[in-house]
Amino acid sequence: MQKRVVVLLLDSFGIGASEDAKDFGDFGANTLGNIAKACFNNLANSNDRNGALKLPYLESLGLGLSALKATNELPLGFESKPNLIGAYAYAKELSSAKDTISGHWEMMGAPVLFEWGYFKDKTHSFPKEILDEIMHKTKIKGYLGNCHASGTEIIKDLGEKHLETLYPIFYTSADSVFQIAAHEEKFGLDNLYALCEEVFQILEPLKIARVIARPFIGANREDFKRTAKRKDYAIKPHKKLLFEKFIEEKQGEVISIGKIADIYAHVGITQKFKAGSLMELCDVTLDQVKNAKNNSLIFTNFVHFDSDYGHRRDISGYANALEYFDTRLKEVLENLKENDLLILCADHGCDPSFKGTDHTREYIPVLFYHKDLQPAFLGKSESFADIGQSIAYFLGLSPLDYGKNLLKFKGQP
């Protein structure tokens, strides 16, 4: 029997601080819960939305109940007895991190059980010897930044100086990352990508997970804005991924939508589709759900929840984006084929009500839909790898090294 899997990952959509959140400075974080609370109390109203958070299709898959199991609190405004059509769980992260790559790798069978390299100093973040090597190997004449920063704020602060000097803007965060912002037209997109490739080669031995190209446009601080031509240069996964097993054992198609291919360093990806906005990501995903052949795994990362709303601590914007996504989820559900398995999950938290601008260490929702799957609570997962192991079971692949299968279909003992 031919099968397809559709994975929709809402980047940063955590459902409550995990038991080790205090170790990460994230005690009290709850991305979903705090958004729902603000909405319920009319503190997230805008021209685009108002009132309680309305996510009927996510609720029908078990989102609210998953959050209830994780935190012992039902998100405000959610139904305690929704019309449940999905099976649901919640998962903690085995990897000792709260970044995009660790979360994604773990769910496909490669938890990060080593320490990433980090740039922990808030100012003068990058060691002089690294900066000297970058200057020497890339021939750039100088750089700006060299600090922890919000990507949108640093281009406001340094964008005009960048246009005067054409020095790239270097910055980082609490994640294992080196980010480079430059003007897409004046500095040049190809020049930015080439610079990032060189920097990635320099930093790879230090286990820096990603170098990210952050192009922007505009003429002054009032109208600088990042473009959709971001590019991630990531370390290759250290273990065989579910994707590779699917290709080797079943000759499957692995379809990346959004930044999935970059996150996995393009390992095990057979088709790639980029998209600029949340609407475009939904459109491309729906098109693949309608048209991808059998024996396919469709995987979309919905980055805007994280980049546009979580990091920017925009509660109303996050709520509005969730409500829009929920309307598009309805279309996905209506267009699933007879033997499709749908999975919704996240990779970490990024609570827009929380201090700072960084990710938050949280449980994630794990929501399944298949016509033969009994709607039920599937338990607490001790690793995001349970997602990949469940997919491997569904597709008839050999087991992954990590995780356990969560799926139990109607008629099974």
UniProtKB/Swiss-Prot annotation:
Binding annotation for Mn(2+) 2: D306, H311, H359
Question: Keyword annotations for this protein?
Answer: Cytoplasm, Isomerase, Manganese, Metal-binding
Major place of residence: cytoplasm
Q: Which GO terms describe its molecular function?
A: magnesium ion binding; manganese ion binding; phosphopentomutase activity
Choose one Gene Ontology CC annotation of this protein and give it.
cytosol
Q: Where does Mn(2+) 1 bind?
A: D11, D347, H348
Quote the pathway field.
Answer: Carbohydrate degradation; 2-deoxy-D-ribose 1-phosphate degradation; D-glyceraldehyde 3-phosphate and acetaldehyde from 2-deoxy-alpha-D-ribose 1-phosphate: step 1/2
Q: Name one Pfam family in it.
A: Metalloenzyme
The cofactor named in the record is: Mn(2+)
EC main group: isomerase
Its EC number is 5.4.2.7
Cited CDD domains:
PPM (cd16009)
Q: Which reaction does it catalyse?
A: 2-deoxy-alpha-D-ribose 1-phosphate = 2-deoxy-D-ribose 5-phosphate; alpha-D-ribose 1-phosphate = D-ribose 5-phosphate
This protein's source sits in the domain of life called Bacteria
**Gene Ontology terms describing biological process:** 2-deoxyribose 1-phosphate catabolic process; 5-phosphoribose 1-diphosphate biosynthetic process; metabolic compound salvage; nucleotide metabolic process
* Record family assignment: Belongs to the phosphopentomutase family.
HAMAP family tied to this protein? Phosphopentomut (MF_00740)
What the protein does?
Isomerase that catalyzes the conversion of deoxy-ribose 1-phosphate (dRib-1-P) and ribose 1-phosphate (Rib-1-P) to deoxy-ribose 5-phosphate (dRib-5-P) and ribose 5-phosphate (Rib-5-P), respectively.
Q: What is this protein called?
A: Phosphopentomutase
Q: Gene symbol?
A: deoB
